[in-house]
């Protein structure tokens, strides 16, 4: 299962991966906001409050993880863009040197 999963990940573009991670981060932030709203507005027992705080801690950790993933993906996307620009410049140089 791990092998097929890595093969599938290799076929996904960096931009679509960024979109997917941003969507997951947004879902976590929305869940976190709902949990914070529930904590403020409802009278919760100690057990419910602790469970809600644990859930909020987990959601905060996920948001931080997604932010780190986004930072890595954006760096990879930037590197790919620079590589594309360099290849375009080299192609243009060869075209104007040998053909034009």
Curated annotation (Swiss-Prot):
This is Coiled-coil domain-containing protein 167. One of its GO terms (cellular component) is membrane. It is found in: Membrane. The lineage of its organism: Eukaryota, Metazoa, Chordata, Craniata, Vertebrata. Keywords: Coiled coil, Membrane, Transmembrane, Transmembrane helix. Residues 14-81 form a coiled coil. It comes from Danio rerio (Zebrafish). It comes from the Eukaryota. It is a single-pass membrane protein. The keyword Membrane applies. Signal peptide: none annotated. The chain crosses the membrane at residues 82-99. Its main location: membrane.
